[in-house]
């Protein structure tokens, strides 16, 4: 635990989402109604689930390589975000933390399981507190997801429009 990390509103806002996700990932019990911001929780959960599905083998290798993983988390967080902080990287750190927590739970290391949400939260805040503050904490994630969805839909509509125009042009050729 890092005593230099300020335990303020940002800390507890981030911890609330991380802690509940870790519990849900380890137990399989839905935690949507235990969080302060259900919409953010669902976004984080869905993104983490995708990352875990796609990267579970790499996460397992990372855990096998480290002899003292719980003490190496701050360094792993630093290595992940030292050159650039993005929501994808922040969510990847949370997903990795959830996986590590589940491994510890399976090994019966409950003392570390209870500390993992705090370790991840502190590691994130010690490296990117100002960025998270500038993002207005989880509101920045919601805006990021909303803007990406808008871009996805606009791109999709352009493709559909292009397909329709092409189809009409082809039909016109045969008439």
Swiss-Prot record:
The keyword Membrane applies. Plays a role in the inhibition of host apoptosis. Interacts with host proapoptotic factors BAK1 and BAX to supposedly prevent their activation. The chain crosses the membrane at residues 152-174. GO terms for cellular component: host cell membrane; membrane. This is Apoptosis regulator Bcl-2 homolog. SUPFAM superfamilies: Bcl-2 inhibitors of programmed cell death (SSF56854). Keywords: Host membrane, Host-virus interaction, Inhibition of host apoptosis by viral BCL2-like protein, Membrane, Modulation of host cell apoptosis by virus, Transmembrane, Transmembrane helix. InterPro entries: Bcl-2-like_sf, Bcl-2_BH1-3, Bcl2-like. The keyword Transferase does not apply. Interacts with host BAK1 and BAX as well as other BH3-containing proteins including BIM, BID or PUMA. It is a single-pass membrane protein. It is found in: Host membrane. GO terms for biological process: regulation of apoptotic process; symbiont-mediated suppression of host apoptosis.
